[in-house]
């Protein structure tokens, strides 16, 4: 499996446009990305991937960058652009549908960690320290938009940021925690995007004296009218996002947890991005689909 994923990543990189660097480096941006993905595929730190003995025999002849070089180059704008281009090529849906789900998945770390950028907040039926991936997911498992934030960051705030730029339309289905006038307004501004969620405090509570978003009133009408079968089916199908998150973790090399060498937001974002790419490659059989 590791070699199939590696060959698929190499095939995709070969199809991407790679602008020339103004500075001559010993190792190209593509070389840096390949070494990085070799580490991520095997769930190993960068110091492991830069050692020749950890590569197949037929790939050991090529020189490898040092650990210091990897750390420095991964922060450069050109390498980050190539990582983003790889994500856009593989992860972003090519034919967006009309049904989308939104939720968050906790990425907990040790409570003793010194990571100052991690937050302490709600995880799965408990409190934990770490980060959380927020994602808008289609029914086929494709991810239209995602963000990584500290565990204590409000899911509704992250949802607003994703909705502003996500290439989606139709229905965005969420649990009651996403019931927010600001989020409904963000969906309205996108046009042809309706947030469907139950009221946060239940149908027996009023809407208060403040002005309500027309999108929120529409969601209340959909979920609380005498015949709410359509909204009920949408909310029932929202459970599919739990299986999508499960598919990120239930295979060797998936996004199971954050290893000890992945700390601070920059490294966590880069690690999660690579895991999303690998999961999409695995799902789409990229070794044959993306070859030019």
Language model regions located:
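Helix-centered, glycine/charged polyanion-binding patches within enzymatic domains
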Residues: 171, 176-259
């Amino acid at each position: 499996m590791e070699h199939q994923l590696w060959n698929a990543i190499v095939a995709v990189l070969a199809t991407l446009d790679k602008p020339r660097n103004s500075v001559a480096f010993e190792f190209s941006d593509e070389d840096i990305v390949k070494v990085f993905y070799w580490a991520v595929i095997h769930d190993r730190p960068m110091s492991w991937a830069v050692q020749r003995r950890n590569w197949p025999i037929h790939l050991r002849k090529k020189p490898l960058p040092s650990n210091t070089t990897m750390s420095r180059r991964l922060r450069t704008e050109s390498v980050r652009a190539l990582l983003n281009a790889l994500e856009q090529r593989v992860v972003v849906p090519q034919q967006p549908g009309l049904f989308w789900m939104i939720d968050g998945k906790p990425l907990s770390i040790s409570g003793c960690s010194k990571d100052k950028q991690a937050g302490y907040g709600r995880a799965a039926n408990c409190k934990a320290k770490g980060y959380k991936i927020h994602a808008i997911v289609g029914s086929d498992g494709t991810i239209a938009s995602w963000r990584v934030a500290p565990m204590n960051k409000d899911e509704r705030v992250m949802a607003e940021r994703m909705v502003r730029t996500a290439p989606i339309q139709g229905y965005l289905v969420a649990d009651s925690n996403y019931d927010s006038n600001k989020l409904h307004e963000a969906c309205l501004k996108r046009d042809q995007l309706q947030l469907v969620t139950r009221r946060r405090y239940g149908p027996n509570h009023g809407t208060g004296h403040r002005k309500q978003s027309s999108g929120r009133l529409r969601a209340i009408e959909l979920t609380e009218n005498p015949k709410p079968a359509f909204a009920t089916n949408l909310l029932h199908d929202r459970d599919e996002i739990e299986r999508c998150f499960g598919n990120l973790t239930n295979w060797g090399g998936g996004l199971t947890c954050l290893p000890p060498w992945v700390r601070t937001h920059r490294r966590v974002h880069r690690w999660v991005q690579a895991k999303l790419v690998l999961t999409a490659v695995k799902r789409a059989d990229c070794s044959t689909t993306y070859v030019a």
